[in-house]
Amino acid sequence: MNLDRLSLLHDVADAVAAAFADVRDFGPSGLRDGQYTLDVVANEAALTVLRRSGVGVLSEESEFEAGSTGEVVVIDPIDGSTNASRGVRYFATAMCMVDAEGPVAALVANQATGERYWAIRGGGAWCDGVRIGPTDCVDVTDSIIGMNGIPPHPLGYRQSRVLGAVALDLCHVAAGVFDGYVDCVTEAHGVWDYLASVMICREAGAHVVDLHGRDLVVLDHRARRTPIAAATPELLALLVAARAGL
């Protein structure tokens, strides 16, 4: 059953990839601030597949749609749409299916490279069929950290990267590419930005929290969170403390 759910998410990612390949207008949609035409095209492609399955949908690009199955897919059709609009090959379709018990399946597909990260509840986390896991880093001074935004002063890390797509940044923590992730912009992210990657991180053995201790699993279009992630509990505590001090 969970594999069927994951298969649905792969089908959605395939549909978005096909629609994106036909996009020629990379400018603003004119419908709301920060939205590109490619976001609208990707969202329509995703909704076409999801509606057929009967699941509910919570998308960044449209209103909540109730379904008939008791499950909801939280989706950002294109996370990192500014990157996509400028030709930066770091943007993804991020999806997490949620049932009455919480996240049950997740997929993050880099639509520029074809790389895909996924997880099912209790089944670990994977990248293109290879099981993934985080590093064992416990010291900020040894860490390479993905970030959203620029802090007013360094947080003690060895190096940092600001790449512009939180869904992929968090997957890189799950896969041991980054040791951690810090959101330096207050209340910047909706649940569609991070939930798929949070599930992938947790199934991989990495740790993710909201800066203020709030639940990250929230089916509310208006809710915003400040995610912090790390390979180990020790590093997470240090990153949370450093971020709280900004």
What are the residue ranges of the model-derived segments?
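DPxDG-like acidic metal-binding loop motif
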Residues: 69-122
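General beta-strand structural signal in soluble alpha/beta enzymes
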Residues: 56-61, 75, 84, 162-164, ...
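Short loop segments at secondary-structure junctions
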Residues: 98-101, 112, 121-124, 150, ...
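Residue-level signal for inorganic ion chemistry
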Residues: 16, 39, 81, 110, ...
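Buried hydrophobic packing segments
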Residues: 46, 50, 93, 97, ...
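N-terminal subdomain of lithium-sensitive/metallo-dependent phosphomonoesterases centered on the IMPase/IPPase/PAP
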Residues: 1-78, 244
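An extended, acidic
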Residues: 52, 132-246
